[in-house]
Swiss-Prot record:
GO terms for molecular function: ATP binding; CMP kinase activity; dCMP kinase activity. It is an enzyme of class 2 (transferase). It is found in: Cytoplasm. This is Cytidylate kinase.
Length: 213
């Protein structure tokens, strides 16, 4: 079984996807980290994330072992990911890796959970379960603010909110694989939900899907 979890930044999709994978003993892939790793590799190489040639080279040379790098959780990595993720050649280079993970989960797992922006629409349109996780931009900005401040970053809420809106616009407006809700996806608004409530709601969605099949 393939479970596709999509949604904008700080919607809670990553936390939900990880907990869902743990609960079901499925393999888990945070596809956003692939783009963060590419973006940071470009920056470390002294290039600009907008440089398509440098970004493509980084995508082709991506080492999955680098996905545990703490720098991938920084705001800089997030912004770079949004930029390189809008480059068609980069998305194409990472597509096979994601699809192979979904169809051949590592370590004999019975299924896979992937989270990102275009899992249900482009990467795994055949996924048996698709959930689009969202929340108001204000709630998402506040979540990101708390996350950054807890990491020791001195940031202003207005700046985080502005960056969040700009990132949403980039993710939804890119020419290739824009963030969109799949026609057969269930929308889960986590604005007023705890992580535990979101997990319960997702498990209910899975149970409902199982009953229909």
């Amino acid at each position: 079984m393939i479970i596709a979890i999509d949604g904008p930044a700080a919607s809670g999709k990553g936390t939900l996807a990880r907990r869902l994978a743990t609960q079901l003993r499925f393999a888990y892939l945070d596809t956003g980290k692939l783009y963060r790793a590419v973006g940071m590799a470009v920056i470390k190489g002294g290039a600009d994330p907008h440089d398509a040639k440098a970004a493509l080279a980084a995508a082709r040379a991506l080492d999955p072992a680098t996905l545990g790098d703490r720098l991938l959780s920084t705001d800089t990595a997030g912004k770079a990911a949004s930029v390189v993720g809008a480059i068609p050649e980069v998305r194409a280079a990472l597509l096979d890796l994601q699809r192979d993970f979904a169809t051949h989960p590592p370590q004999g797992a019975p299924g896979a959970v992937l989270d990102g922006r275009d899992i249900g629409t482009v990467v795994c349109p055949e996924a048996e379960v698709k959930i689009f996780v969202t929340a108001s931009v204000e709630v998402r900005a506040h979540r990101r603010l708390q996350e950054l401040r807890s990491g020791g970053h001195d940031v202003k809420e207005d700046d985080v909110l502005r960056d969040m809106r700009e990132r949403d616009a980039r993710d939804s407006g890119r020419a290739v694989a824009p963030m969109a809700i799949a026609a057969d996806a269930v929308v889960l608004d986590t604005s007023r939900m705890t992580a535990e409530q979101a997990l319960t709601a997702a498990l209910d969605i899975l149970a409902h899907k199982s009953q229909k099949t």
